[in-house]
């Protein structure tokens, strides 16, 4: 953990928005070491699946941003509960929004963002025009901001006729294996 503490300290002159997932979530004491060694903001949460996993890092103020994946967390209601638990500790949200989640989850992220007082930043993939064609109503980026659709619900829909033009092609995320064949995390 000394390496991570030193890294966080050496990154200070670069004024990172945050250092993301520097540790596995169960290493609470190591978060404390990094926190004591550096002023670089810390973000954690992609591996969390419940609000209960987040709580120890909140109550001890060991992170600055919570980065859960709303789809893995249990949806909008659970994400709002996590945000409510984080807010008294001045912890902001930075929901996980990579390219391997679809437009509906990005819609959910933005809807939570605009409904909470401790929104920080939103990781976002800007989908190509064909995705916008198939999923009208996905969040739009205009004037330096993300805008949710004003349509009911999540605001996005599926255009089934447009989807027929782009048949499904099976794809897989890489499997992370060590040289001995054992599976490890990303």
What residue ranges belong to the model's regions?
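Extended hydrophobic packing segments that form well-structured cores
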Residues: 154-186
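Short glycine/proline-centered loop/turn elements that form peptide/ligand docking sites
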Residues: 6
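Shared catalytic-loop signature of beta/alpha-barrel
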Residues: 9, 15-18, 26-152
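Short, small-residue-biased leader/transition segments that mark boundaries at the very start
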Residues: 1-2
């Amino acid at each position: 953990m000394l390496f991570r503490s030193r890294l966080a300290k050496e990154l200070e002159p670069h004024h990172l928005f945050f250092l993301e997932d520097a540790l596995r979530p169960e290493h609470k004491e190591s978060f404390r070491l990094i926190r004591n060694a550096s002023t670089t903001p810390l973000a954690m949460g992609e591996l969390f699946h419940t609000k209960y996993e987040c709580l120890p890092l909140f109550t001890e103020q060991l992170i600055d941003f919570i980065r859960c994946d709303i789809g893995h967390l249990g949806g909008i209601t659970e994400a709002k509960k996590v945000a409510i638990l984080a807010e008294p500790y001045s912890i902001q949200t930075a929901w996980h929004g990579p390219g391997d989640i679809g437009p509906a989850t990005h819609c959910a992220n933005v809807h939570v963002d605009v409904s909470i007082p401790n929104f920080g930043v939103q990781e976002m993939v800007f989908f190509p025009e064909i995705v916008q064609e198939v999923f009208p109503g996905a969040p739009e980026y205009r004037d330096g901001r993300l805008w949710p659709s004003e349509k009911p619900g999540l605001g996005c829909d599926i255009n089934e006729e447009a989807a027929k033009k782009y048949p499904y092609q099976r794809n897989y995320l890489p499997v992370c294996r060590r040289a001995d064949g054992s599976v490890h995390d990303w």
